[in-house]
Amino acid sequence: EINLSVICGGKYSNMFYAFLSQLQTKHSTDNINPDYLIDYPGFSSIYNIPLNIPYFENDGSWLGIDFRGENELEAHENAIKLARLITSKIEQIANTQSQSTIVIFIPNEWQNFENFINKEESFDLHDYVKAFAASKGIATQLIREKTLEDSLTCQINWWLSLSFYVKSLRTPWILNNQEKNTAYAGIGYSVSKIKDKSEIVIGCSHIYDSNGQGLKYKLSKIDNYFLDKQNNPFLSFKDAFQ
């Protein structure tokens, strides 16, 4: 079975529970994106495994979170305060629910606290929470309020169900007729946007075999990079080899 835990503001709990519960039911494509989208038949029908969604009343796997920015604080101070509140809730769940993906509801009212850039640092709430959880081996899924308002219900349920399945460390499919000695690597980067500071590029790669197994991550600072005409950073031969 696949277990979810939830962090959600009290006044949104009913709405968010109803949204997550849609994963258990059928949804038609309504002829939207017919080239690649098919009807969603329900989580257990697709993956042949139950999905356990906690109820928002009297369940330790569903934690409330209430945050309002304080007027006497700067926007970036409120942003950090919110991020630390969320990570404290993640730790609280992780201490009792070790085998679950933690779903975090991000309401529109938190929009002003989701990111900032000043002379000292740049901040992104999504990245902060993801980095914190990843460092502790905790799977998370952030869902913004606007996702609940999106009309592409079938597509969203496919995307979300696959995300929960994969984050439970299961493999949804493998490719046929792949070379056994083939390996795959994905590389990403992050460029600092802080003014008056040199650009910082972080190389993030994941490596896995031809069956999509043996996934490994590597995160490291890259010093000897060069920029193309579009200012996209590329690894030097030495960094790429390492």
Region roles according to the model:
Residues 1-242:
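Long, low-complexity, intrinsically disordered terminal regions
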